[in-house]
């Protein structure tokens, strides 16, 4: 699912075991046993499931049926698919047809936390942290309303936050590695704070051990399964709907909607409504688009997979105005006036042109010497327009050198070449995580080579470019048709 919270820089294997039980565990409520025994097995709904479906998923399906979330009219069901588990069509489904609806009372979001027993102690926390604690508490409780949902949640994913040191060494030199380590540090710091300020101070609400690994499990579940595009909903887990897998064939993100409708006998509620973005035949898998804007590195971090095509290959160039620059104040003012700042991040994707503001920003950062007159206040309203075109040969040559040196430095940090990685991909037989690693480092290197090629070609054109001085003379009518400067002799 889509990423739903910002991570700021964004032990061996962190595979999580089920939460351990303790002697201090609360007593089971008799009502739960009564409730559990009253689950009726609808033979028709059970026989329609593949017998290879894991038992927890079958029990989860029974629960959805009993609660009325699934009816005989529901056109999809769980199925074994290449991704593992997914939703498949029971009949032909039209593009845009509603395939499932889940009432708000089954959503897991900050509102659900606020209404729970831990609502008061979580009121001042970041939304994702409060939901993470809620997940851990509900997973521990045998009488949880969401018990059957908790039982089908994966113990881990192939997200890089769960990789071992050996596995992480395969993405040495990549931006994904530095982002992964930043995320892990961020989660660890947040856990230490919430453990001290909330968990340990409220043992009556959390009478079970919560470890860092447990917290990482909850973080990974939210990162990989939460929806974030509903009206007024920035963080929401939707049981049943989150069984839907991603596919690049889906090129829109308007599949999820919040509607009001029947949510039980004589009751109406808000519903999470999911529509099929593709036309399906019976037996086809239902797919959605998780996020069109994520790079393959984002996909690996959030979901634990990448797309095989290179369309999501990307590299982020970070540029900044140095505080030691003698024109720091003027440059910062110009940058901020034009919607940027002291530091700028430019996402460059394979096969696409450079971001439109990248070259002007580079020229601004490199501005100096005889070109510094453009920083004077008289040019303040027009300088950004001037930076959209070459300023001087020296300025243009400098930005080419700076970018090419940065690309060469980044490329030297990888322990394999493009050719070596291409060979590994062609040979195949890679484990899931190694395939992700090779795909990520290969994609980053290809983008870096693309950037280097752009500026290498620009270096070859330096003598042919028209610079500010020449443009200014033309504006004043002081350059002839052949480019020669016109001198006016006094009579």
Swiss-Prot record:
Pfam families found in the cross-reference section: Rubis-subs-bind
GO CC terms of this entry: chloroplast
UniProt GO molecular function: [ribulose-bisphosphate carboxylase]-lysine N-methyltransferase activity; protein-lysine N-methyltransferase activity
EC number: 2.1.1.127
Principal location listed in the UniProt entry: plastid
Localization, UniProt: Plastid, Chloroplast
Catalytic activity: L-lysyl-[ribulose-1,5-bisphosphate carboxylase] + 3 S-adenosyl-L-methionine = N(6),N(6),N(6)-trimethyl-L-lysyl-[ribulose-1,5-bisphosphate carboxylase] + 3 S-adenosyl-L-homocysteine + 3 H(+)
InterPro entries associated with the record: Rubisco_LSMT_MeTrfase_plant (IPR011192), Rubisco_LSMT_subst-bd (IPR015353), Rubisco_LSMT_subst-bd_sf (IPR036464), SET_dom (IPR001214), SET_dom_sf (IPR046341), SET_RBCMT (IPR044431), SETD3_SETD6_MTase (IPR050600)
Domain SET span(s) in chain numbering: 67-291
Alphabetical GO biological process terms: methylation
Keyword annotations of the record: Chloroplast, Methyltransferase, Plastid, S-adenosyl-L-methionine, Transferase, Transit peptide
PANTHER family membership: [FRUCTOSE-BISPHOSPHATE ALDOLASE]-LYSINE N-METHYLTRANSFERASE, CHLOROPLASTIC (PTHR13271:SF113), UNCHARACTERIZED PUTATIVE METHYLTRANSFERASE (PTHR13271)
Known function: Methylates 'Lys-14' of the large subunit of RuBisCO.
Family: Belongs to the class V-like SAM-binding methyltransferase superfamily. Plant protein-lysine LSMT methyltransferase family.
Protein's name in the database: Ribulose-1,5 bisphosphate carboxylase/oxygenase large subunit N-methyltransferase, chloroplastic
Source organism of the structure: Nicotiana tabacum
Lineage, broadest ranks: Eukaryota, Viridiplantae, Streptophyta, Embryophyta, Tracheophyta
């Amino acid at each position: 699912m889509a990423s739903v919270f910002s991570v700021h820089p964004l032990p061996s294997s962190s595979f999580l075991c089920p939460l351990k039980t303790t002697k201090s565990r609360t007593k089971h409520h008799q009502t739960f046993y009564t409730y559990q025994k009253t689950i009726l097995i609808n033979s028709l709904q059970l026989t329609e499931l593949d017998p290879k479906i894991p038992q927890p998923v079958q029990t989860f399906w029974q629960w959805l049926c009993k609660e009325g979330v699934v009816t005989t009219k529901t056109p999809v069901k769980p199925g074994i698919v290449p991704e593992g588990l997914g939703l498949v069509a029971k009949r032909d489904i039209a593009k845009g047809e509603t395939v499932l609806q889940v009432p708000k009372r089954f959503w897991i979001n900050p509102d659900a936390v606020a209404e729970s027993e831990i609502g008061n102690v979580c009121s001042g926390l970041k939304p994702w942290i409060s939901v993470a604690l809620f997940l851990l508490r509900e997973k521990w409780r045998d009488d949880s309303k969401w018990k059957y949902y908790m039982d089908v949640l994966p113990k881990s994913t192939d997200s890089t936050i769960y990789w071992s040191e050996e596995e992480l060494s395969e993405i040495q030199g990549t931006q994904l590695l530095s982002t992964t380590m930043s995320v892990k540090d961020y989660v660890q710091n947040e856990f230490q704070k919430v453990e001290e300020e909330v968990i340990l101070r409220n043992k009556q609400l959390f009478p079970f051990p919560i470890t860092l690994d447990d917290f990482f499990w909850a973080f990974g579940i939210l990162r990989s399964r939460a929806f974030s595009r509903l009206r007024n909903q920035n963080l929401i887990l939707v049981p049943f709907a989150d069984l839907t897998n991603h596919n690049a064939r889906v090129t829109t993100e308007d599949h999820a909607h919040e509607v009001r409708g029947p949510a039980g006998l004589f009751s109406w509620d808000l519903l999470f409504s999911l529509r099929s973005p593709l036309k399906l035949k019976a037996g086809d898998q239902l797919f959605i688009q998780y996020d069109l804007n994520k790079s393959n590195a984002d996909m690996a971090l959030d979901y634990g997979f990448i797309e095989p095509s290179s369309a999501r290959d990307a590299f982020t160039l970070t540029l900044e105005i140095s505080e030691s620059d003698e024109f720091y104040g003027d440059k910062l003012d110009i940058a901020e006036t034009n919607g940027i700042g002291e530091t700028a991040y430019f996402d460059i994707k394979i096969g696409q042109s450079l971001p439109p503001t990248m070259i002007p920003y580079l020229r601004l950062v490199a501005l100096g010497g005889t070109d510094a007159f453009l920083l004077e206040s008289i040019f303040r309203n027009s300088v950004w327009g001037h930076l959209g075109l070459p300023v001087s040969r020296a300025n243009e040559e400098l930005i080419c050198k700076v970018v090419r040196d940065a690309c060469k430095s980044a490329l030297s940090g990888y322990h394999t070449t493009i050719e070596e990685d291409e060979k590994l991909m062609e040979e195949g037989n890679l484990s899931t995580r190694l395939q992700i690693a090779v795909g990520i480092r290969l994609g980053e290197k290809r983008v870096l080579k693309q950037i280097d090629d752009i500026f290498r070609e620009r270096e070859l054109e330096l003598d042919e470019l028209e610079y500010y001085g020449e443009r200014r003379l033309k504006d004043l009518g002081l350059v002839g048709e052949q480019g020669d400067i016109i001198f006016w002799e006094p009579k």
